[in-house]
Amino acid sequence: MIDYVGVCNTVDWSKLILDIADQLPAEIGPKHKAGDPLPGLNQVTDMWAKAGYKTPDLGGTVSWDMFFPGVNFDQSVADKFAEYVGLKDINSCWISRIWPGYFAPIHWDVNDNEIELANQPDKLRWHCHIGKPEFGHVFIADDKCLYNQPQGATYQWSSRKLWHAGTNCGLTPKYILNIW
């Protein structure tokens, strides 16, 4: 389940985007490939293979950039947002960027530490639309399709493992902050 929280304006989202726009991302997704030994990964990669999804190196358009606090932007951004949503301990935080013409098909975010996480209670997750509303910036989580969201629009997820997808059929990069 996904619920609207409100508009977070404790961070200057436009300035943050300007700060990372010309940086190389810390990672380019999808990071994990079929056969990597992570619980839950094959569920995602098998589905993608069956549907014919491909990454750019194989002639496809499944790709997104990932920016991390302490690497690409100041940790205070994650801390301020965590305070806004009431998250006491940050497990993971990143900003995803999807370029025009690219997308992230249906998936849940399989984590490098999935084996350890399997022994812990599930965690809530939040995302924030940090870019201004733009034509073609679409985000789908659970049963909600989010489009033309105001800058700072924040949603809480009932699980970090919620199925979601994003696409950019617009003309400018699409940015979303994720945290759990």
Each language-model region and where it sits:
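Residues at beta-strand starts and edge strands
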Residues: I2, D122-L124, P173-Y175
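Short acidic (Asp/Glu) patches
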Residues: N72-F81, A104-I115
